[in-house]
Swiss-Prot record:
Its cofactor is Mg(2+). GO terms for molecular function: 2,3-diketo-5-methylthiopentyl-1-phosphate enolase activity; 2-hydroxy-3-keto-5-methylthiopentenyl-1-phosphate phosphatase activity; acireductone synthase activity; magnesium ion binding. This is Enolase-phosphatase E1. Pathway: Amino-acid biosynthesis; L-methionine biosynthesis via salvage pathway; L-methionine from S-methyl-5-thio-alpha-D-ribose 1-phosphate: step 3/6; Amino-acid biosynthesis; L-methionine biosynthesis via salvage pathway; L-methionine from S-methyl-5-thio-alpha-D-ribose 1-phosphate: step 4/6. It holds the Pfam family Hydrolase. It comes from the Bacteria. One of its GO terms (biological process) is L-methionine salvage from methylthioadenosine. It catalyses: 5-methylsulfanyl-2,3-dioxopentyl phosphate + H2O = 1,2-dihydroxy-5-(methylsulfanyl)pent-1-en-3-one + phosphate. Gene3D superfamilies: 1.10.720.60, HAD superfamily/HAD-like. It comes from Shewanella denitrificans (strain OS217 / ATCC BAA-1090 / DSM 15013). The keyword Metal-binding applies.
Amino acid sequence: MSIKAIVVDTAGTTTDLNFIQDVLFPYSHQVMASFLAQNQQQVLVESCINDVRDIALEPSATVARVAEILQIWITEDRKLAPLKTLQGLIWKQGYSSLAFQGQIYPDFIEAISRYRQQGVAIYSFSSGSVEAQKLLFSHSEVGDLTPMFSGHFDMRMGNKLDKQAYLNIHNTLGLPPKQILFVSDTQEELTAAQAAGMMTCLMSRGDAFAPTEHKQVGSFTALNI
């Protein structure tokens, strides 16, 4: 059964993990307090602030305290919806001001065109919000790549380590799971996708190939459909 859709992880797969860890995360940590102070009246920001209070079990937390909690979560790389939403809003400002540009691996840029020419649809799946993914790909160093994608998925599909997230994705796409290939640098995510019936491929960039039950490549150049 031929592959009709490829779902790609972002950090470590299409995007240098160092860009996420050394540029995007520190930027959101640095400006979080001022961003909340300036935008706390916006409906979405206010909703995220209240969600942080609920998750942290601090219903009376000040906005400054909420910022501190979020900064701790950034340091801990917590996969929590209000944090990811706020990071997306903050990164939007950073991209717009040209504080940074999205760093996408050249082999993926080449491959995405090749796959589309073969009639294969491309989607991304990240713990970062859909908004953050669109920002990453629309403000890349080579320009706007979003027209090359057929869609994006985030934590609203479920936790990336849970089988249900991948069941939700293939139900959304309306394709048999065996026609969907999930590519990630994290074996636990691939195992969850495999349990949902998807085809899988481990992206091992710059490392010796690891023992795995999944197909394994060192770049998208080697991933032929």
